[in-house]
Design a protein with these regions (language model features):
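Helix-turn-helix
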Residues: 21, 25, 29-63, 67
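Hydrophobic alpha-helical connector segments
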Residues: 63, 67, 80-108, 165
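Amphipathic alpha-helical segments used for helix-helix packing
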Residues: 79-86, 93, 106-132, 143, ...
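Amphipathic alpha-helical packing segments from all-alpha helical-bundle domains
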Residues: 104-115, 126-152, 162-166, 197-204
Length: 207
């Protein structure tokens, strides 16, 4: 009796292409069925690879989800916005640039941010740790924005630098985008314009 060997159409492709196929398949399945409803076997079948290949190329389900989230956490819009904030002497421009940067980051990764992590959040500790890291990085970025506004002596008299971070989180954090764009179905353009105006009113002494 001969054992039929598994043949993968992707076997001759590079490891990078295989990894991308796995992540793309997982992305589609997670959004369609929810994270808990997807198995490694389904991911392998959709990606046209063997189950062991999924584990060796990316890892288990939490690692796959972490890999999908990583581009949102390291989006170049974040570094670009912070560089522009550091170079600006105009408090309004600082907030406008920050609003645009957070808008771009959310818009580019909206299917994951809203479609998966908000509406049907995975419960694994490993995934929560990555999300917590993302939230911490987000706050650190907004802290740099608040520090720049304080350095420009632009904050309202009743707003301390620490409170400025809280207000930036309130106006520019993920929940603002989820509420306006996801739940209330605003366009990203409309949400960005309102968020920037509201943040200026809340934070700046001359608004």
């Amino acid at each position: 009796m001969t054992t039929r060997k598994y043949h993968s159409p992707l076997r001759s492709r590079s490891a990078t292409a295989t990894r991308e196929a796995i992540l793309s398949s997982a992305h589609t399945l997670f959004l369609a069925k929810g994270y808990p409803g997807v198995t490694i076997g389904e991911i392998a079948e959709t990606a046209k690879v063997a189950v062991p290949t999924v584990y060796s190329s990316v890892g288990n389900k939490p690692k796959i989800l972490t890999a999908l989230l990583e581009p949102a956490l390291t989006d170049p819009a974040i570094a670009d916005s912070l560089a522009a904030v550091a170079a600006s002497d105009d408090p309004r421009a600082v907030i406008e640039v920050t609003a645009e940067g957070t808008r771009l980051t959310h818009e580019r990764h909206w299917d994951l941010v809203y479609g998966l992590f908000y509406r049907n959040p995975p419960g694994e500790p490993a995934v929560k740790a990555v999300l917590d890291r993302g939230a911490d990085d987000y706050v650190q970025a907004l802290t740099r924005v608040a520090d720049r506004l304080a350095a420009l002596d632009a904050l309202s008299a009743d707003v301390s630098p620490a409170e400025a971070v809280d207000l930036l989180w309130f106006h520019l954090g993920p929940h603002a985008w989820i509420t306006l764009v996801g739940e209330r179905e605003w366009s990203f353009d409309r949400a960005r314009a309102w968020i920037a105006r509201a943040a200026c009113r809340a934070l700046l002494q001359d608004h």
